[in-house]
Amino acid sequence: MSVEDVVIGVLPDEVAFLAPLLGTWVGEGRGGYPTMEPFDYGERLTFDHVGDTFLQYMLRSWLLEDGTPLHFERGFLRPGTEAGAVELTLAHPLGLTEVSHGTLIDGHMDLVATSMGRTATGMAVVGLERRYRIDGDEIAYELDMATETTPMIRHLTGRVRRVSA
């Protein structure tokens, strides 16, 4: 059977509560950190159902000023064991892996990293917290970050709009 013959079908019941996230979202945000100058960025975020009990997550961002690539993330959003619970597993090209746990309830998805992995040359991130507010075809979000030398502080804020389902 070829890839073209595979039918994704309907979302399984276990992930139906994640349906409001499905699609490709594009927007802009503002970033900063004590160790860097503030910056404005564009972003493309995709939550895609690939036929199983999870969603695939893909993110890429770029500087609005000149289009320079900034960041990429790839991973999976899965249901947890309790109603509304979610688990996010991500790989970052900065030499990091992230496992976050949280909830998606009434359009609010809040996640806290419970495990961070790092390569020998990976960025010294020790904590991440993500907050998403889903309102129809718009998502507003915030990301807080802690490193070995900086406590948890706001790093990114942005807003994306669904451009395809």
Question: Model-flagged regions — what are they?
Answer:
Residues 93-96, 104-106, 110-129:
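Acidic, glycine-rich flexible loop segments
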Residues 38-40, 68-70, 94-95, 123-125:
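Short solvent-exposed loop/turn micro-motifs enriched in small/polar/acidic residues
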Residues 42-48, 73-78, 99-103, 127-133, ...:
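Hydrophobic/aromatic beta-strand elements that line small-molecule binding cavities or substrate pockets
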Residues 27, 55-59, 84-90, 109-113, ...:
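Short hydrophobic/aromatic-rich beta-strand segments that constitute the beta-sheet cores
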Residues 60-62, 90-94, 114-119, 144-148:
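Secondary-structure transition/turn motif
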Residues 1-54, 62-69, 136-137, 146-165:
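Amphipathic/hydrophobic helical signal segments and adjacent flexible N-terminal regions
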Residues 48-53, 82-83, 104-107, 134-138:
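Short, solvent-exposed coil/turn segments at beta-strand boundaries
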Residues 64-103:
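Helix-adjacent hinge/juxtasegments
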